């Protein structure tokens, strides 16, 4: 999904439509308005976590999106500490250290509320589209929509349909 001069909104819509039409996404449906929970997210999470740049990190900030749940689960199972934004307290995070914390519904029971993501070494944000230069296009609003700007490396997960050589519009974050 690419072309000439395209707005970010038009590119998001094109990606969402292709994912829906080709049935390459899972709950929540429809994918429009979300960072899609794409088929293959678990494999993408495994690949990212095993990448040499990521393997050295022990503490991550990870978005709350459903597409990132496999990454949260795998990271917690391998002993990483995660900070996930608190859904009801803006600016707060859940500090998570056990696999039960991968699910948003379990975070209040197993997580520790924290104001700052202490010791975080990298960020993983969900996306609607990404490019090979590191550009990321989120859903256009909400937590992490424009990146976090914490001076930490930021990563994302994407289905090949969501990935292009270069975004046809300005990236939300890089």
Enumerate the language-model features and the residues they cover:
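Surface-exposed, charge/polar-rich loops and edge strands
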Residues: 1-35, 46-57, 78, 90-174
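Short, contiguous, pocket-lining structural segments
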Residues: 7, 36, 40, 63
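Conserved beta-loop-alpha segment that forms the PLP phosphate-binding cup at the N-terminus of a helix
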Residues: 41-45, 67-69
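Extended, H/D-rich, highly charged conserved domains that either
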Residues: 60-76, 80-86
């Amino acid at each position: 999904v690419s072309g000439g001069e395209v707005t970010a909104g038009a590119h998001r819509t094109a990606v969402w439509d292709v994912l829906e039409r080709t049935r390459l996404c899972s709950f929540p449906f429809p994918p429009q308005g979300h960072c899609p929970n794409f088929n293959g997210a678990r494999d993408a999470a495994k690949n990212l976590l095993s990448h040499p740049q990521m393997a050295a990190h022990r503490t991550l900030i990870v978005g709350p999106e459903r597409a990132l749940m496999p990454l949260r689960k795998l990271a917690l199972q391998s002993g990483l500490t995660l900070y996930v934004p608190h859904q009801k307290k803006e600016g707060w995070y859940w500090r998570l250290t056990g696999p039960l914390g991968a699910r948003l519904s379990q975070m209040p029971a197993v997580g520790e509320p924290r104001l700052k993501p202490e010791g975080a070494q990298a960020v993983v944000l969900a996306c609607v589209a990404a490019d090979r230069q590191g550009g990321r296009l989120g859903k256009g609003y909400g937590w992490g929509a424009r990146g976090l700007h914490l001076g930490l490396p930021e990563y994302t997960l994407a289905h090949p349909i969501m990935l292009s050589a270069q975004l046809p519009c300005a990236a939300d974050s890089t």
